[in-house]
UniProtKB/Swiss-Prot annotation:
This is R-spondin-4. It comes from Mus musculus. The lineage of its organism: Eukaryota, Metazoa, Chordata, Craniata, Vertebrata. Activator of the canonical Wnt signaling pathway by acting as a ligand for LGR4-6 receptors. Upon binding to LGR4-6 (LGR4, LGR5 or LGR6), LGR4-6 associate with phosphorylated LRP6 and frizzled receptors that are activated by extracellular Wnt receptors, triggering the canonical Wnt signaling pathway to increase expression of target genes. Also regulates the canonical Wnt/beta-catenin-dependent pathway and non-canonical Wnt signaling by acting as an inhibitor of ZNRF3, an important regulator of the Wnt signaling pathway. The FU repeat is required for activation and stabilization of beta-catenin. Glycans are attached at residue 34. It is found in: Secreted. GO terms for biological process: nail development; positive regulation of Wnt signaling pathway; Wnt signaling pathway. Its main location: secreted. Residues 138-197 form the TSP type-1 domain. The keyword Glycoprotein applies. InterPro entries: Furin_repeat, Growth_fac_rcpt_cys_sf, R-spondin, Rspo_Fu-CRD_dom, TSP1_rpt. Keywords: Disulfide bond, Glycoprotein, Heparin-binding, Secreted, Sensory transduction, Signal, Wnt signaling pathway.
């Protein structure tokens, strides 16, 4: 009796160990059974509901699919946050990575990136950047111009501080091209060095006011002594 019973116990233990090994193998390969960050999870299909702030990424292999909860969606997918769930959605067919369904960040081979779109070729007036395959406008900035007069409240005179500005134009690299190029400008703080007509320097005005107050005090003293 003991021999068949021991054999039966060993067989049951072997079955349990085999099932445990399969579960560990599935979790290690990223297929079903990886329930990290899940609210609802199954060994066969993985996660179906994720914890808050995580994205549900569903990977399909043939007719089977496996869910996984991730902090960031993998390359070729972008995250969509919703009231019920956050999901990873696949980018467009020509996008390698994207910010949304309508805005690509990097295109697949043989496509060129222009204003978030992946195009077969760059539009007229643009050139392809060799490393990024981005379409860039053919503009070369000219040297900076001279600084403008220092202006405060629309005036070039006064006291205190104002702003001075300089500009440079970004013209087409080739004169025959008609790319739309922008004007660049920058401003910086500057001191107003010239007083407006009829205006006194605040420092001189303060000194004059102090002198007048001092003179009035001196005038009062003899009057006060005489009244005593």
């Amino acid at each position: 009796m003991r021999a068949p019973l021991c054999l039966l116990l060993l067989l049951a233990h072997a079955v349990d160990m085999l099932a445990l090994y399969r579960r560990k193998k599935q979790a290690g390969t990223g297929l079903g059974g990886n329930c990290t960050g899940c609210v609802i999870c199954s060994e066969e299909n993985g996660c179906s509901t994720c914890q808050q702030r995580l994205f549900l990424f569903i990977r399909r292999e043939g007719i089977r699919q496996y869910g996984k909860c991730v902090h960031d969606c993998p390359l070729g997918f972008f995250g969509i946050r919703g009231q019920e769930a956050n999901r990873c959605k696949k980018c467009g067919a020509t996008c390698e990575s994207c910010f949304s369904q309508d805005f690509c960040i990097r295109c697949k081979r043989r496509f060129h990136l222009y204003k978030g779109k992946c195009l077969p070729s760059c539009p007229p007036g643009t050139l392809t950047h060799q490393s990024t395959r981005e379409c860039q406008e053919e503009c070369e900035p000219s040297p900076w111009g001279s600084w403008s007069p220092c202006i405060h409240n629309g005036k070039t005179c006064g006291s205190g501080w104002g702003l001075e500005t300089r500009v440079r134009e970004a013209g087409p690299a080739k004169q025959e091209e008609t790319a739309s190029c922008r004007v660049l400008s920058e401003s910086r703080k500057c001191p107003i060095k010239r007083l407006c007509p009829g205006e006194r320097n605040p420092r001189q005005k303060n000194r004059k006011d102090r002198r007048q107050r001092k003179d009035r005090k001196l005038e009062r003293r003899p009057h006060q002594r005489g009244s005593q």
